[in-house]
Regions:
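A short, conserved alpha-helix within the catalytic core of class I
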Residues: 129-139
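Conserved beta-strand signature within the Rossmann-like core of class I S-adenosyl-L-methionine
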Residues: 144-153
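Class I SAM-dependent methyltransferase SAM/SAH-binding core
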Residues: 59-100, 104
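Conserved class I S-adenosyl-L-methionine
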Residues: 1-45, 49-58
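Short conserved loop adjoining the S-adenosyl-L-methionine
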Residues: 109-114
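Short alpha-helix
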Residues: 176-194
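A short SAM/SAH-binding and catalytic strip from SAM-dependent methyltransferases
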Residues: 119-131
Length: 213
């Protein structure tokens, strides 16, 4: 568990209600632009028959799309157990339950307990982790071919929004915090294990970075 919060604080933010909202949005609208950018990049690098490791996959929408495009199997690493009901429902509806393994583990703290995969994905995860370098370095070590992650765009609008959300959590005595980490420093951490940046998508809300080995 990252040092920014205790387990109760984390569970209260990534609650069952949050999971239902994410699941409902995916059913109605499909992938967000950032999630679509992740899926498209991973697919462009060769997804057929690939194994995927998604760190913090939540309700599984990115994984489902990668499996539909030809990935063989996905391992999802999670900290919050509040996603389980919605994730199981989406996987069942997609007929993909047997192709996904869900584990509860923090890869940055226990990297040796996680097997490598062809593709490693982190969507809207780095912003929730205080030690981004440790997380991204661990993710890169586990990527045989491709690493792709999203992060909040480092602009004034996002800084105001994140600051307001963190301020509210401070007032309610919730120690969970979100972060807008330095984009270039994140790239440096991701490249530390022999990977090279081959794709970047910039947007007002979420940026996407893709690396290959």
């Amino acid at each position: 568990m990252p040092e920014c919060c205790n387990n109760d604080d984390y569970q209260s933010v990534f609650s069952g209600r949050f999971a239902r909202r994410q699941s409902r949005r995916y059913r109605r609208r499909g992938l967000t632009p950032a999630a679509r950018g992740i899926v498209d990049f991973a697919t462009s690098q060769g997804i057929t028959g690939a194994t995927v490791l998604e760190i913090g996959g939540g309700v599984e929408h990115v994984q489902i799309e990668l499996l539909r495009r030809g990935a063989e199997h996905v391992t999802n690493l999670e900290i919050s157990k509040n996603y389980e009901t919605e994730a199981a429902r989406l996987l069942d509806q997609a007929g993909m339950t047997e192709r996904v393994t869900r584990r509860f583990i923090d890869i940055a703290e226990a990297p040796d307990e996680v097997e490598p995969a062809d593709v490693v994905v982190l969507h809207r995860v780095v912003c929730c982790y205080p030690d981004y370098a440790k997380l991204l370095e661990a993710a890169a070590r586990h990527a045989r071919k491709t690493l792709v992650y999203s992060h909040p765009a480092a602009n004034a609008i996002n800084r105001v929004q994140f600051g307001a959300e963190n301020g509210y959590r401070w007032l309610t005595r919730n120690d969970f915090r979100t972060f807008i980490h330095p984009p270039e420093q994140m790239i440096r951490a991701a490249k530390a294990n022999g990977m090279a940046v081959t794709f970047q998508r910039h947007a007002r809300d979420w940026d996407v970075v893709g690396l290959t080995r």
